[in-house]
Amino acid sequence: MGVSFSCPFAEQDDVEAALDSVTVKSISFGDDDECKTPKRSVNFNDGTLEPTILKSMGSGKMVVEKSVSLKGMQLERMISLNRSVKDNGFEIAKEFSVLDPRNPKHEAAIKLQKVYKSFRTRRKLADCAVLVEQSWWKLLDFAELKRSSISFFDIEKHETAISRWSRARTRAAKVGKGLSKNGKAQKLALQHWLEAIDPRHRYGHNLHFYYNKWLHCQSREPFFYWLDIGEGKEVNLVEKCPRLKLQQQCIKYLGPMERKAYEVVVEDGKFFYKHSGEILQTSDMEDSESKWIFVLSTSKVLYVGKKKKGTFQHSSFLAGGATVAAGRLVVENGVLKAVWPHSGHYQPTEENFMDFLSFLRENDVDITDVKMSPTDEDEFSIYKQRSTHMRNHSLEEDLEAEKTISFQDKVDPSGEEQTLMRNESISRKQSDLETPEKMESFSTFGDEIQSVGSKSTKVSEDYDSGDDEEEEEEMFELEQESMPSEQSSPRGEEKEEGETKESEVVKITEESILKRINSKKETKSFQLGKQLSCKWTTGAGPRIGCVRDYPSELQFQALEQVNLSPRSASVSRLCFSSSSQTQTPQMSPLWRGMSLPTDITLTNS
């Protein structure tokens, strides 16, 4: 016995229109006997009968089938419902709406992916800058060991192999960055170079502590990868710089459009903001402790702003780029009251300060009554006492060290190698206190910040004050930590010459090496400005320029080590630990076949 029931409804264009349906009911008790009810038609146009059907979400066709069969005292019942929606079936569309390019959620997801990919690329370029610089110094040391004709290092006396290897590691640890556009721009120290190439521009003073930690650990991961993703992700230097402080203090690097709000012009001897036309006023009754800073760019454009420690500093104006002069000032109603050279980043010299005074005279600024020293006398006197105490204390230590070394030389003449190392350490200490009469035409990164005239050293000692005192007191300690000795080789390097493998150094032609060396000698500076292929307007300049400035072989090696080169698959197994391999993303097809990403040169930091 079977019973079937069907309700095919007619297709309608309008839900509210008349709906006709035909109902056919048949009852079957076997194959022979069949009873079929007559066909009945029901019209819902008249209001006499309330429709009892389900309302569809749109125009369509609904079929309801019901069958009942009795076989062997078993009841089977099946109900099927088929519905096809044509116009407004949003149940199905809702599931795939996120894939619609017009959906805001889809756009947000794509944007998030692009931002992450862009940040990942910037981090890899920053690691490239560190790796390629270390490879360059290692290459030069190999060249020096094999041939003495490369006139790069001015060595007046014979050095042992161990001493030279230690010096090479020292230079690799003191990687720094600077820029020279007009020959007078000051350079950034190591910690500020790290700050400039860091995609987040974390405060270089804080970043330097973790850089030293990375140098002395056994990890083979690049620095920024190690710090943010790899083995050093959980490292927290609580006593020196907690991880929270490192992440919170990020320096704001202004772009070309952002820095226009800080541009200041001088009209009739008064200072005005060029963009807004407002008169410059640094004296604030509500915030008397505020400090206002300025920089003069190499194109003679003046920028003035309020300093915020760990957020906005001298390097913020030009995105870590070069300046002719930098310091602090006091302006009341557009009239200059005080100005003095002070910048922890740029270390302005007396010559830089004189250039700034010339700039003021050219713009008809009366500097007769302008005070050229810190306005807070108490702060100035305290700092002067501190600096005097530090100098005297250091001189006493140096004298004692010299006596000790002299005594040991008499007792043990065979200790030539150790004596050379100690003398080298003492000379580095003295470079912080004394200034050579003649600057070398080509100085190392670590020593260049100290190579200034004797007058400029006095100006720096007298005028520097404020928040950077702590940085200057800790700088020598940081540099000593960045200089591993023979007993402590950083990042798993060999301790002795015999254990060093020549195969680890990329083979580069002598022509390429001499070409870069000669270009540096011509510019009288080991800086990036004249070698950059793109205009340095954002924080992307240091990252890209640092890589482009080196021979192509070193570029390829550094790009491979951070998986930005087609050959990085095999190299990554050698340069990354097993834990970092699984976390390192695959290379994007965008970089495949490219020696260096050229389309990122205009990317903002």
Curated annotation (Swiss-Prot):
PANTHER family linked: IQ DOMAIN-CONTAINING PROTEIN IQM2, IQ DOMAIN-CONTAINING PROTEIN IQM3
Chief site of localization: cytoplasm
The protein's name in its UniProt record: IQ domain-containing protein IQM2
Native source organism of the sequence: Arabidopsis thaliana (Mouse-ear cress)
Signal peptide (residue range): none
Residues covered by the IQ domain: 105-134
Keywords: Cytoplasm, Nucleus
InterPro entries for this protein: IQM
Subcellular location field: Cytoplasm; Nucleus
Region annotation Disordered: where it falls in the sequence: 408-505
Record's function text: May be involved in biotic and abiotic stress responses.
Biased composition annotated in UniProt, kind: Basic and acidic residues: 425-440, 491-505
Tissue distribution: Expressed in rosette and cauline leaves, stems, flowers and siliques, and at lower levels in roots.
Acidic residues bias spans: 462-480
Low complexity bias: start-end ranges: 481-490
Induction of synthesis: By light. Down-regulated by treatment with mannitol.
Phenotype of the disrupted gene, per the record: Long hypocotyl phenotype.
Keyword Oxidoreductase: no
GO cellular component, one term: nucleus
